[in-house]
Structure formats: structure tokens, C-alpha cells
Amino acid sequence: MNQDFEHQLSFHSNNNSNSNHHHSYNNSINSGSSSSGSNNSSNNNSFNDEIEGGEIQEEPYISSSSIRTSELDQKILFLSKDRNLSKRTGSEDPQYGSFFNTLSEPLILSQQSHQQHKKQNRDQHSSSSSSSSSSSSSSSRSKRSNQPPPLVGIAAINQQQQHLQKQKQQLQQQQIQIQLQKQQLQQQIVQHQTELQNKSTPSKTSSASSPPQNTLSAPAPPAPAPTSAPTSAPTSSSVSSLTQPQKPKSVQYSQPAPLEIREEKVDPNIKEEFENTESKISSIIQSMICPISPLRSPFNESIVYTNISSSSSDFDYNNSNSNNSNNNNNNNNSITENNTDKMINNQPSSTNSKKLKTNEIDSKDTSNNNLNGADFKKTTTTTTTTTTSSTSEPIKSPNSSSSTNSSASTTPTVKKEKLILKIPKLVVKSDSGTNKESNSSNSSSTTSTPKSKDLEEKKEKEKSEKEKGEKLEKSEKSDKSEKTEKTEKAEKTEKSEKSEKSEKTDQLEKAEKLEKEEKTEKKKTEKVEKAGKVEKKEKPKDKQTKQEKEKEKEKEKETEKEKEKKDKVSSKKDELQPIEEDKKKIGGKRKSINSSKPEFKSDSIDMDIDEPNPKSSSNYNDSDDDSENEIDKSDKRSQKKSKVESPPKSSKLSNGKDKKSTTTTTTSTSSSSSLPSLSSSSSSLPLPSSSSSSSSSSSSSSSSSSSSSSSSSSSTTSTKIKKEEPPPPPPQQPPPPPPQQPPPPPPPINPFSVSEHDKKIIEKETGKDLGSSRDRDNSSRTTNGRDSDRDRDSREGSRDRDRDRDRDRDRDRDRDRDRGRDRGNGDRGEGDRDRDRSGRSDRDRDRDRDRDRDRDRDRDRGNDRDRDRDRDRDRDRGRDRGSDRDRDRKDSNSNNNSNNNNNNNNNNNNNNNNNNNNKKDNNNNNNNNNNNNNKRDGNKDGSSSELTPKKTKQEEKLIRSQIDQIKEDAKDLKKLAKELQSKNQNECLEMYLQVGLKYLLTTHYMIEVNDPLPNIISFLSEISLFFSNTSRLALHFKDDPKASLCFKCESFCCIKMFCLKKDNLKHTRKEVSSVYSSFLPNSSSSSKSSSSSSSSSNQPANPATAPLTPNPGNPSESPSQASSSSNPTSTTPSATTTTTTTATTTPSTTATTTTTSNNNQPNTSHVNTKIAQYFKDTEDIFRGMDAWEKSILHSNIPGFHFNFFYQPYLEFIDQVKKESDKQS
């Protein structure tokens, strides 16, 4: 039976150096005559090559003109819209993959479809030859410069139409050349048919396994792996080229790098599987006949093709064409048409044995074989076509992970379709066991001789019978091999897991050792620093040298670790090589099972890994050297593209200081599930090669992975660059480690452990808390109430006890140490014992001094606390008085009656509560005595503005020396003044006045030095007496101005004494007012009325009413006396304000204390002593007021009016000197 075969190989290449030009080659091999009489028509343009002939039927899809036109429109639209195919990294279309992305432009669709329908019935005879490819490649170079950039809108459509017309004209010229080449090829086919008749099947087997007989040294065609049942077996496209290359003159190629050719021994089991080469040849012929459907994207992980079923008639053409295929050695379809003999001879024969070993090779294996094949990267201008294979498997969706074999159908149908790829080289193996016949009509089939047709029919019948017998044998062998392979793979995975676990444990132990060493070094450095602080003898140079030495040691350790890790990696490589070779032998079924979980392992990772992760999950690989060998230097843009597509490379660590961060990456299962284009074969790796050197499977996987990286980050983390070895050794495929192996858990950490650094921080904080808590207590005294004072007392008491306990413990420790030293060194001399005894006494003395200092500090703190507490209590009482004063005014009449009744009740309860009052009074007396004994603490809040902060010792010495000097000068002046007084001379008054001013200056310095308060008050009282006597002497001499100055000085001294006693007077007044609070409401109105009436009527108050009130002086006298004066000064209103406040505040405690003091009446004797003390202390203010009034009476000095309560000593002394100078 005469049949026609047609092989349409469409090329689409995109060169980055030019403006994305698309060109195509139309190649076909025609022989025999057509039985069906159908014609093959192809519409050749630069954007679409469609082969149509006979009745095109596709089992999953209904072939019709509408479906065909829709597919054509979509392809035309895509190709006309987006030409920059090498840079497309967008999301994949679920039907067309990353290549055929549908774009909606109805104008282009309508115009392009109209042009396609016009040329559908035009017969085209396609053939593959070197001249056609070379001419098309040369024309493609010329057309690159004419390629317009993609435009938008009507102008873009017009330009594209014009460009299409130009290319059509050029293609018509090419068709004429192609027809001439067809005739030459037909003659060659007749010759091969005659040669095949004379050869037997053993010669075919030898030609399949041994190197080719032709001068073209290239790997043998891939052997088919038949499957016995419709079980899951992933499909893969087969590669074949059937024409003898002819070296074109118009194309020049760069010389490829010389490669060594290795021959590997083929296993006897594999030889038995492929003894019958007729099935192999039929699969090769079948793969050439069936083109790829445009609905299937070549950029999917594996290409699924249409199912072409035909009658079970044998092919006579297989025998005629087998020698041609063996001579060409399946140089990836029509590579021989484009490449020279030198290019093809560079492929080592090692790939032949690799292809024979595998029943089904996924895209990853094909990419590895291509890497060690001919160096196609050198030919930047040549392009290759996608391999078209007719498999016995139904069409699956691009997302399907496995495809099943379908039974042979008897209807002879051929689906001839065209696919344009951007990747020039595709190496795909066909595993179809039963190759179905397909009918294709060619107008040139009539030229073949009838003898060749008869021979072909006979041989095809023989093949069909033999193939049926081979199916059963191969299926049994495949089952056995799969079982053995499963067991071997399980053992290998267990070994790899054990090795990885051992490495992890070793690395963890090393990390722990490093941490321990670092801790020890830190301890040493800390000890050195402490010793340096104590001794302060180490020089900075020594420290720097030590630090440098430590750094050098650390560097050496790190370098040693790196070396050890490198050695481990290299040893592991050697272990993995035999495993990799065994994995090459695994059958298609095993790979289909594991295809959904591909895991990749880098051959070498030069990293300083601190905490090891599984190497399968590492993202980076050091592939700098190999990438330089792979990337074509002449094509820089393709080199950049490959760098973009490849994952980021890990920068080598400098000196091993940078440690690899433990990155837990997702395994390849997530990446395979995220890629919608995954088919039965496992995902291939993106190789960093140029567009003219990478295979279509690797490029398809790279494009799909790059497109999916935008949607899922897990795919990018799982994919890795497979490091390529130099050409002489065959490519090794590392075995996949156990899937989804989690990273090792971190070493256990003790949650209760505390580092030394933390210990130091805690010690520092605890040491600071002792001082800071005191400051906090001082700052919170004014805000906290009585409860906070109580808490503070308990806290400070416990702190003091702790301090004493620590001191006693230290003393006991020292004593025990000394006893042990004395006991151990009893033979020592007396000098040593004396020395130890003196040291002990010194320590005890220091300890006692510290204890005394602490006791004094605690006493001062207690006094301050008592004074602050009293101040707070006064503030609270004043607040209560202010609120109760209005209430007392409103209810004065009712209160009078109620108070009379309360007085009777209180008299009955006085005896019961005398003891409690006595205790309180004693406590108050103790507090007053403490306040009086303080140096000058009680006057800090008073009105003595002359008080200064504490001086240093040197300043105190200077001030005290000045005090002594002033006293001596005063004595001398006093002697002179007495001598003048004995002579009744008036100059003595001036002398006495100067002496008194010197006394005032000494009091100023005494306050500066913080002398005891009683000393200052007694000294001021003596000065006041001195000035009063001087004023009397001045009156005796009838010198009124001098007398007035002396009275003013006396008033100044009395007022300053009152200011110093003011705090004590407050306390006594409060105590007396609290005692007599029950009696005050009746007398308060009278006292207020008396004070107001006296101030208004200028009448002196009755002094007899003084003992009835807590303010016995009845301060209304001072305003009356001041107002009675002829010239009231600024000091008198100030005096009135201070005294009236005391008078008004004392009766205001009635409301608060009436309820509490009813049962707490004091003892009359004790109260009388308090009142007497108060009277004595308040005499100073009245003396001062009297002296001021006398000075005004005797002489009114203009401009000499000051507020003595707040005037500094020095200012007053200067003013007095000026006035005395004026008077003199």
C-alpha cells in the first residue's frame, strides 16, 4: 500500500540582538504515492505556517473549518501583536501556555483569517533540507532590519499588513527553491530504499546502538519504550532528522568548542529491548509525520501531542528511511539542515547510550543531554524546529500530570498542525511502543517508483507483526525493572537521609562548640578587663594586640570549618555519581509516579552553613564558572536574558565570616503544583544559556517558572540552577532527596539560663536601685500621703537592717579569715601578727565609721521626713479650715449654744484622756527638740533668703578665717569706742555703729557656713541688745539720726531672729491651737471683731485677752501701732499681713478638731508651758516692730524704708554705712 508522508517542521526563533524577527522554515520529506489522493496545502508566511491535507481528525477535538480558522486567527493575532517573544514573562494562558496569549483585536482577526482562507487550497510540498534552511536563515537575517516595532491602533495594523505582504512575496520565492530541493531529496530517498532492501535487522540494531556509519558523527536516535497497557506513562516528544545535510554557502557559523566523545557500554537488558529496530524506525518516521498541535504550548513542562490513529498497515518507508535517520543520528530534527558537519560531529556518542537507557526521559534529562551535546550556542543565527511526534496516547490538558496510552484505532487520520517556538532546540524522546500509521497525500508522491512502494508495504507488514510480539516482552521487562528500581531507590533515599542527618548532627555539634569557645573567650576578656580596671596597668597597645590575636584565631577556625564543609560536599558528590547513573535507568512508570514531586539538588554549594538545611531546599548555587562556559560571548543580550531567568546566584563568602541564614524553602511539590503547565514529565530546570543554545523543554520550563514566579513565590524558591559540568564527562542527574524533608530543629535552649552579660546588667541595676530609690523617696515625699510615709519607713528600715546584716557578715568573714590565717601560720613572727591586728583594727574602724555615717544619714532623713509630714499635715488642715470657715460664719449662733453644751461634756471626759494627750505631747516635744537640734534644716522652707547651699571645706575655711578676722577688728574698734565714750566724745557713736555692722556681717557668714541655729539666734540677740544700748547712748548725746539708725539695726536683728524661729513658732502655735480648738469658736468672733475694730479705730487691744487665744501677743497691736505712727512705712503692712494671718488661721481649726478633741483635753500645766514658750519666742517680732517705730519717731530718714523680713544682710549693712556717712 502506497502512502505519502509529510513532515512539517515550523521554526520560530527570536534573536535578542535584533528587533524580534520571526521566520519559519518549511521542510518535508515526501516519498511513495498517495492512496487517499488528498493534497497538502500550506500557507507560508513569516507569522504562520499551516499544513492542511486530507481529512484532519483529532479524537478529543472535532476538526472543522471553524475550529481551524479560530486557531489561525488566534495565532495570527498573537504573533502580530507581540513579537518580543524572548522577553515575555507574563502569566500563562491555560490553553496556549506562555506562548499563545490571546489578544482581542477584531480587525486583525478578520483580515488575517480572510488571507488564510484564500490560500488554504494552495498545494505546498514541504521538505527539510540544508539549503532551504540556510536560505531561509539568510533571508531571516535580511529581514531583521525590516522588522517594524509593534505599534498600537490603525497605523500599527496597516504597517503590519504591509510587512506581511512583503514577507509573502519573499516566501513565494523561497517556495520555488524548495520545490527544486524536493526533487533532489526524492532521488536520495530512492537510493536509500534500495540500500535498505539489502540490509537485515541485525545491522539495524547495530546501527541503532553503535556510532553511525556516516561521516556525520552524532548521537543515535532515541529508542522507543513501548507500554503494554493503557497505564499512566508520561509523553515526550521525539527528536529526529531524516535528511542528509548540505552545507549552505550563504550562512557562516562560528567554530564550536571541540568536545570529547565518550562511548558508554549499553546494558544487555536495554539491548534486548531494542533489538528490533523496525519499531524504532517506525516511531522515528511517525514522529516526523505528525506535527505539533498549535493548541499545545511548547513552553509547558512536557509537550503533549495529538493522537494520530491510522490503519495497522506496515510502512515500507521505514526501511527506506532508517539508514538516513541513523546517518543523521537524530540531530534534533533539522539541525543538520542548518548546521555544518563540524557542528554535528561535536555531539558525543555518550548521548546515544543515555537515550537508550531511558524508557521515558523528562525534560530535565533532555536538557542535560543537550548541554553535553553539540555546542549550538555558537551558532547564533541558526534556528531549529520543534520535534513533532505521533504518539499512541490521547490528548491531555496541559495541566495533566500523566497521559494514558490508547488502543490503536483503524480510522486513518492525520492532524497536521504548525507550532512556532522561540527556543531553537528541543530534544524530546518518544516512548510510544506502537506507532500508528497515518495517511498523508503529496503531489510529489507519483515520482517514486512502484518497486520502492511494494517493498515498503511488505516491510511495514512485517513490522506490525513483530511489534505485537515485542509489546508483551517489553511490558514484562518494564514491570520487573520498575520493581527493582523502586527497591533501589528506597534504599538510596534512606542512605541519603542518613547521610544528611549525620551531617546535620555534626554541624550542630560544631555550632555548639563554637558557642562554648566564644563564651570562654568572652569570660577571659571580661577577666582581663576587670583586672585592668583594678590594677590600671595594662596599656592600650597590649589590649589591641590581644584583640587582633583573638580575631586571627577566629578567622583560622572559620577557614578550617569551610574546608571541612567543602571536603564533605566533594565526598558527597562522589557518592552521588553512581546513584545518579542508576537513576538514569529508571523507567517511565517510576518517573510518572515521581513527576509530581520533583526535587533538585545542586552539585556543590560553597557555603558556610551554621545550621544545616536540606540541600534540596537551598535557593542558590555557585554556578559562576559553568555559566561562563555556557553563555555565548557573541550574544550579549541572550546572556543578559539567561541571567534574568536564572535564580540569583549566591555570592561567595569572604573569609567565611558571613554565615548563611537558615532559609526554610518550600519543596518542589509546591512549585510543581503551582505551575499550570506541568505534564507527566518532571519540571525541567531553567538553564542560564542563550536563546540559541537551550532546548525547547528547558526554555519552556524557564518561561513557565518565570511566569509563575509572579503569582507564587514557592516556585521560585524551589527551582535551582543545575550546575553543568564540562563537556567530556556525561551529564549526571542527582537523585532527588526525600520529599518535603523538614529542616532540623534548633538545639534545645535552657529557658532558665542567664548569660553573663545579663548578669552584669542585673547587678548594675540592683546597685543603682539603692541610690535611685532614695532619690525617688525624696521626690515623692511631697506627693505621697501618710500611707506612703509608712511604707517608706518600713522599706528604709528593712534596707538598713540588710545593710547592717551585710556589714556584720563581712566582719565575721574577715574575723574567720584572720583566725584561719593565724591558725595556719602559727610559726610566724610577732611582726606579722601585729600587722594583721593593725589591719583588722583599720577595717573595724572603717566599718564603724561607715555605720556612724549611715546612722547620721538615717537620722537626717528621719528629721526631713518628719518635717515634710508636718508640712503636709498643715496643708491639709489649712484646706479644711478654708472649707469650714464659711460654715462657721453661717452657723455662729447655733454653734454658740452647741459649744456650751459640749464644754460641759468635755469637762466630764477630761480625766479619762489625760494619759493619751500626755503621750502625744511628749512625742511633739521630741519632734520639736529634733527640729531645734538640726543644723539649719528647719529654715530651708522659711523666709531666710540668705541661706546658701552647703559650702565645700575650702570655702568654709576661708569664711571662718574671715569671721575670726572680723571679730578681731570689732574688738579693736570697740576698745577705741570705749575710750572715746570715757572722754564723752560724740565720735564713739560712729565707732559703736561700725562694730555693730561688723557683728551683722559675722552673722551673715555664720549663716553661709551653716552654723547651728541656736548659736546664730543667740548672736543676733546680743547684737540687738548692742544696738539698743548704742541708740540709748545716741539719745544721751542727743544725736537723733544716729539713734534712728541704731533703732533700725535693732529692728533688723529682731526680725531676723523671728524669721529664724518662724518654723518652731508654727509648730507650737499648731499644738496650742489644737488643744484649745474647742474654746475658740466663741472667742474667734470676739478676736476677729477685736482685731478688725482695733485696726479700724486705731485703738490698742487689751493685752489681758492674749492668754485666752493661741496667739497671745494679739497681733492687732502691731497694725494699731503702725497706723498710729505719723509716717507708716512699707514694713508695717507686711508685719500686719503676717500677724493677721496667724490670728485668722488659729480659730479656723474648730470644725475639724471639735469632734476629735472633745475627749482629748490637755493637762493645764503642760499647756501653760507651751504657751509661755510661745510668748517668749514671739517677743522678737514685737521688739522689732517697737524699735522700727522708735526710729521713725526720732528721725525720719527719707529713702530708708525696707522690708527687713526679706532684706539681705549685706544690703542692709551697705545702706546703713551710706546713711552714717551722710550724717557724718
Swiss-Prot record:
<feature type="compositionally biased region" description="Low complexity">
    <location>
        <begin position="228"/>
        <end position="241"/>
    </location>
</feature>
<feature type="coiled-coil region">
    <location>
        <begin position="950"/>
        <end position="991"/>
    </location>
</feature>
<feature type="region of interest" description="Disordered">
    <location>
        <begin position="316"/>
        <end position="416"/>
    </location>
</feature>
<feature type="compositionally biased region" description="Pro residues">
    <location>
        <begin position="727"/>
        <end position="750"/>
    </location>
</feature>
<feature type="compositionally biased region" description="Basic and acidic residues">
    <location>
        <begin position="451"/>
        <end position="585"/>
    </location>
</feature>
<feature type="compositionally biased region" description="Polar residues">
    <location>
        <begin position="242"/>
        <end position="255"/>
    </location>
</feature>
<feature type="compositionally biased region" description="Low complexity">
    <location>
        <begin position="1078"/>
        <end position="1108"/>
    </location>
</feature>
<feature type="compositionally biased region" description="Low complexity">
    <location>
        <begin position="662"/>
        <end position="719"/>
    </location>
</feature>
<feature type="region of interest" description="Disordered">
    <location>
        <begin position="430"/>
        <end position="957"/>
    </location>
</feature>
<feature type="compositionally biased region" description="Basic and acidic residues">
    <location>
        <begin position="260"/>
        <end position="270"/>
    </location>
</feature>
<keyword id="KW-0175">Coiled coil</keyword>
<feature type="compositionally biased region" description="Low complexity">
    <location>
        <begin position="379"/>
        <end position="413"/>
    </location>
</feature>
<feature type="compositionally biased region" description="Polar residues">
    <location>
        <begin position="341"/>
        <end position="353"/>
    </location>
</feature>
<feature type="region of interest" description="Disordered">
    <location>
        <begin position="1"/>
        <end position="67"/>
    </location>
</feature>
<feature type="compositionally biased region" description="Low complexity">
    <location>
        <begin position="316"/>
        <end position="338"/>
    </location>
</feature>
<feature type="compositionally biased region" description="Low complexity">
    <location>
        <begin position="1114"/>
        <end position="1165"/>
    </location>
</feature>
<feature type="compositionally biased region" description="Low complexity">
    <location>
        <begin position="126"/>
        <end position="140"/>
    </location>
</feature>
<feature type="compositionally biased region" description="Basic and acidic residues">
    <location>
        <begin position="755"/>
        <end position="892"/>
    </location>
</feature>
<feature type="compositionally biased region" description="Basic and acidic residues">
    <location>
        <begin position="630"/>
        <end position="646"/>
    </location>
</feature>
<feature type="compositionally biased region" description="Acidic residues">
    <location>
        <begin position="49"/>
        <end position="58"/>
    </location>
</feature>
<feature type="compositionally biased region" description="Low complexity">
    <location>
        <begin position="893"/>
        <end position="933"/>
    </location>
</feature>
<protein>
    <recommendedName>
        <fullName>Uncharacterized protein DDB_G0284459</fullName>
    </recommendedName>
</protein>
<feature type="region of interest" description="Disordered">
    <location>
        <begin position="1078"/>
        <end position="1167"/>
    </location>
</feature>
<feature type="compositionally biased region" description="Low complexity">
    <location>
        <begin position="10"/>
        <end position="48"/>
    </location>
</feature>
<feature type="region of interest" description="Disordered">
    <location>
        <begin position="193"/>
        <end position="270"/>
    </location>
</feature>
<feature type="compositionally biased region" description="Low complexity">
    <location>
        <begin position="430"/>
        <end position="450"/>
    </location>
</feature>
<feature type="compositionally biased region" description="Basic and acidic residues">
    <location>
        <begin position="948"/>
        <end position="957"/>
    </location>
</feature>
<feature type="region of interest" description="Disordered">
    <location>
        <begin position="111"/>
        <end position="151"/>
    </location>
</feature>
<feature type="compositionally biased region" description="Low complexity">
    <location>
        <begin position="193"/>
        <end position="212"/>
    </location>
</feature>
